[in-house]
Amino acid sequence: LGDTPERIPEVLQRYQALRRVDVLRLQNAAWNAMEWFENVGERYADQLPPEQFMYSMLTRSQRISHENLRLRDKAWLEGFERWFAESAGLQLPAHVPAPPPMFTPYTVRGVTLKNRVVVSPMAQYSCVDGLPGDYHLVHLGARAMGGAGLVVAEMTCPTPDARITPGCPGLWNEAQRDAWMRIVDHVHAHSDARIAMQLGHAGPKGSTNAPWDATGADHPLPEGNWPLIAASALPYLEDGAIPRAMTRD
């Protein structure tokens, strides 16, 4: 390509285009490793168990995954998995392979999850007057029966004016309490998953359309709006309602 001086700029430009992404990946891996040594390595070197510290160090660049380690040193990783499983409370016979760390129990403040798979909150915008119904029972129940250790229900609002949209769930009256209890009882009866709730407040994003509304997601409702309160008197979008800034009173 560079057989004449006039083509040198073109060659350099093509070389940069081909190599730029790979160079960025290497730089990012180096940056991650540097931050690990500056933070994890310095703060926890004398606190973490040797096995955990070594695993953290080997994966510090975020370019070497759990299964990558198996390709590099299968015996070491199997020993680490057994140590991790026993640290999580599993008693495994010598002939039984240890499960991957994701599928070991995890205990938080006296609550033990059967594994470390967590279903994150997923906003559904499908309530009427904040009341979860059959849709939510099926949605959350299916995730619980799918094998996750913990299922977290979508953002639930403690007051009507804390909602993002009219379809957001709430927990400000007894009817909603009973509806949530029905879902919790269903999860407990048909799975060994734990279920939790994400409590939240819309802030400046409140009183807006559902994502699929023809007038545009996150834009103010055409009617039936409610007053907003937020950390500051700034709208969520330029054409959004201006919330009242919170005070200590």
Spell out what each predicted region is.
Residues P5, G133, G170, R177, ...:
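Active-site oxyanion-binding pockets that recognize sulfate/phosphate
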